[in-house]
Amino acid sequence: MPELPEVETTRAGLSPRLQGRVLTRVIVREPRLRWPIPPDLDTQLRGLTLHGLARRGKYLLFDFGAVTQLVHLGMSGSLRLTEPAEPAARHDHVDWRFDDGTILRLRDPRRFGAVLLTENAPGHPLLAGLGPEPLSTAFDAAYLHTQCQRRKTAIKPLIMDAHVVVGVGNIYASESLFHAGIRPGVAAHRLSRAACARLADAIKQVLTAAIAAGGSSLRDYVQSSGELGYFQLQTRVYDREDAPCRRCATPIRRIVQAQRASFYCPTCQR
C-alpha cells in the first residue's frame, strides 16, 4: 500500500506540473473503486483551475477553489503524468486532461483507491478525525508518550493508527521501531518518555529518508514520472525474515500483528 512517503513523493512530483493549469476534461473508465467515483466528476471540475495540491495523511487534496478533490491510492494505486499519445492500459481507470495537453492518469489494479469531491475538506469524514502529521511539530515525544499512556495495545499497531498519527504504514513502522530499539510487540503504556522520544525521532528520520528515496516500490507503486522508488533497497528489517541484521548479524524475525507482518531484530530491539 502506498504510505506517506509514496503519497508525498507523488504530490511533490505533480504539483509543479499541474498547479495553475485548467482542467479541460475528466475521463472515467471504471467508476467502481473503494467508493463509486461521483458520476458528475467531469461536470463539476471541467474548466476549473487547480490552485494547489496538498497532502493529509495518505490523501491527496486537489484544490479547485470551491471544490476539493480527494484521491487515495488504496492498496495498489499510482498517479502518473502521461502524454496524449500514450494509450490507456487495462487498469488505468481515470484521466484528468489539462489545458497544456498534460494527462494525469490513475492506475489502480486492485481498485481499493478513491476519488471523491468535497466543499469542506477539513470537515470531510475521512479527514476530520485524523491525528497529527508525523513530520510536524505537533508530533513529538510528549504527544506520543501521552497517547501511549492511554493504551495497552502493542506499540506497532498504535503508531499505525491514523487517529494517533497519520501515514505511518507497515514498512515504516517496522523500520522506525528498529531505529528506536523497540520491539513491535511491546505494550505501548510501558514505554518511557525517553523511549517515546527515540521513537518519535526515528519516525521522522525514516519518513524523511524514504521521501528522499522516492518511496518504496514493492509491487505497483511508481512515482508520478513513472520511476520506481528506492527506499526498499535500504530497509533494515522489513521483509528480511531470517536475513542477518545489518547491525549485529542476528537473524531478523517475523511475527504477525493485527494480520500484518512485523519484522524486528531480537538483539537490537528490546
Curated annotation (Swiss-Prot):
Its EC number is 3.2.2.23, 4.2.99.18. CDD domains: EcFpg-like_N. Binds 1 zinc ion per subunit. SUPFAM superfamilies: Glucocorticoid receptor-like (DNA-binding domain), N-terminal domain of MutM-like DNA repair proteins, S13-like H2TH domain. A zinc finger (FPG-type) spans 236-270. It catalyses: Hydrolysis of DNA containing ring-opened 7-methylguanine residues, releasing 2,6-diamino-4-hydroxy-5-(N-methyl)formamidopyrimidine; 2'-deoxyribonucleotide-(2'-deoxyribose 5'-phosphate)-2'-deoxyribonucleotide-DNA = a 3'-end 2'-deoxyribonucleotide-(2,3-dehydro-2,3-deoxyribose 5'-phosphate)-DNA + a 5'-end 5'-phospho-2'-deoxyribonucleoside-DNA + H(+). The active site is at residues 2-3, 58, 260. One of its GO terms (molecular function) is zinc ion binding. The keyword Transcription regulation does not apply. It comes from the Bacteria. Keywords: DNA damage, DNA repair, DNA-binding, Glycosidase, Hydrolase, Lyase, Metal-binding, Multifunctional enzyme, Zinc, Zinc-finger. Belongs to the FPG family. Involved in base excision repair of DNA damaged by oxidation or by mutagenic agents. Acts as a DNA glycosylase that recognizes and removes damaged bases. Has a preference for oxidized purines, such as 7,8-dihydro-8-oxoguanine (8-oxoG). Has AP (apurinic/apyrimidinic) lyase activity and introduces nicks in the DNA strand. Cleaves the DNA backbone by beta-delta elimination to generate a single-strand break at the site of the removed base with both 3'- and 5'-phosphates. HAMAP family: Fapy_DNA_glycosyl. Monomer. This is Formamidopyrimidine-DNA glycosylase. It comes from Thiobacillus denitrificans (strain ATCC 25259 / T1). The lineage of its organism: Bacteria, Pseudomonadati, Pseudomonadota, Betaproteobacteria, Nitrosomonadales. The gene is mutM.
